[in-house]
Amino acid sequence: MGDYEKYIVKPFDWAERPLIHHDREVMNGLGPLMAFLNTDMVADADLNIFIHHIDVKTPPGPEYVDVHAHDVSQAYVFPLPGIRFEVTLGDEEHVVDSPATVFIPPRLRHTVKIIEGSGIEVSIVRNEKYEQSLAEDAGG
């Protein structure tokens, strides 16, 4: 193995692992959540990248993410057309059709709900471990 081969990793199904502020049972009902990068995969990683394959069979989709904030920035990326979602940023609610990206600055309270459609959601959170990124008491 070369010096840098350790930086090439394969995703794995997050399956039944917990994810703070997320209802995993409901998420699993929408489709699998795959971990593409975290410190379990690459010890030096300072990003957590998840891809959620989503298929809302009966609109509107269920709520599965509690309002929360991180001490670091986050981005939700919906790269393909086919999903309508609602994102709450602070006290503002926005309904958005994919493709779209939502940048969430550090400490901004937020949540996301998939209203209808099918496709993928990419979540990118800065920090070594997702749990370490959560803000205790964030305004906004």
Regions picked out by a protein language model, each given a short descriptive name:
Residues 61-62, 89, 105-108:
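Short acidic (Asp/Glu) patches
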Residues 1-61, 65:
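A short, N-terminal "cap"/entry segment at the start of jelly-roll beta-barrel domains
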Residues 35, 48-53, 74-78, 101-103, ...:
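Ordered hydrophobic segments in well-structured contexts
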Residues 1-18, 115-140:
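Double-stranded beta-helix
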